[in-house]
């Protein structure tokens, strides 16, 4: 059995409902519904969720670990939430959050406007910092990757949009 799939999920302040092939996790920050693969059994034991494969096949074993990680992320998301921090490096690079839009000045001849999907919020504590928050880990990471994709860090000066914890290795310029 999968090592990840064996460990139970603690439901710290989250309610879980199992209904016809789907699990709904409800918490103080919102609700996430996730389809459960038929090769995985989910059991709710007062305060913890236990997942187990239906049979001893490799696929069921692998999916039990995957489903456990996805459900654990949903529980974490509805109780504490997820956030991803981005930093803008470069002269004149600025960000401004306006409602569900993120306005970016990234050295192009036009401003870049990124529309935030439902359930995701962007904050700009300073003009060069962006904090993307939400309850769905996958969506938060996807939006952060899309924003970074507008101007990824270049290898010579390091200018561009980077994750706050990202280390950009700079190349040396050509010498004559």
Swiss-Prot record:
Pfam families: Ribosomal_L6
GO molecular function: rRNA binding; structural constituent of ribosome
Listed name of the protein: Large ribosomal subunit protein uL6
One Gene Ontology term, aspect cellular component: cytosolic large ribosomal subunit
GO terms of biological process kind: cytoplasmic translation
UniProt keyword terms in alphabetical order: Ribonucleoprotein, Ribosomal protein, RNA-binding, rRNA-binding
The organism of origin for this protein: Burkholderia mallei (strain ATCC 23344)
HAMAP family found in the cross-reference section: Ribosomal_uL6_B
Subunit structure: Part of the 50S ribosomal subunit.
The keyword Ion transport is annotated on this UniProt entry: no
Family to which the UniProt record says this protein belongs: Belongs to the universal ribosomal protein uL6 family.
């Amino acid at each position: 059995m999968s090592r990840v799939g064996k460990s139970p999920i603690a439901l710290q302040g989250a309610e879980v409902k199992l209904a016809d092939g789907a699990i709904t996790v409800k918490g103080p920050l919102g609700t996430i519904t996730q389809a459960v693969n038929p090769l995985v059994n989910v059991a709710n034991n007062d305060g913890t969720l236990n997942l187990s494969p239906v049979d001893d096949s490799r696929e069921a074993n692998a999916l039990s670990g995957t489903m456990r990680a996805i459900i654990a992320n949903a529980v974490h998301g509805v109780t504490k939430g997820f956030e991803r921090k981005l930093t803008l490096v470069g002269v004149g690079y600025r960000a401004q959050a306006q409602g569900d839009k993120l306005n970016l000045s990234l050295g192009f001849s036009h401003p870049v406007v990124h529309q935030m999907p439902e359930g995701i919020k962007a904050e700009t504590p300073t003009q060069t910092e962006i904090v993307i928050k939400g309850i769905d880990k996958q969506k938060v990471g996807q939006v952060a990757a899309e924003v970074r994709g507008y101007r990824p860090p270049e290898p010579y000066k390091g200018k561009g949009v980077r994750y706050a914890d990202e280390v950009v290795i700079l190349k040396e310029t050509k010498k004559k």
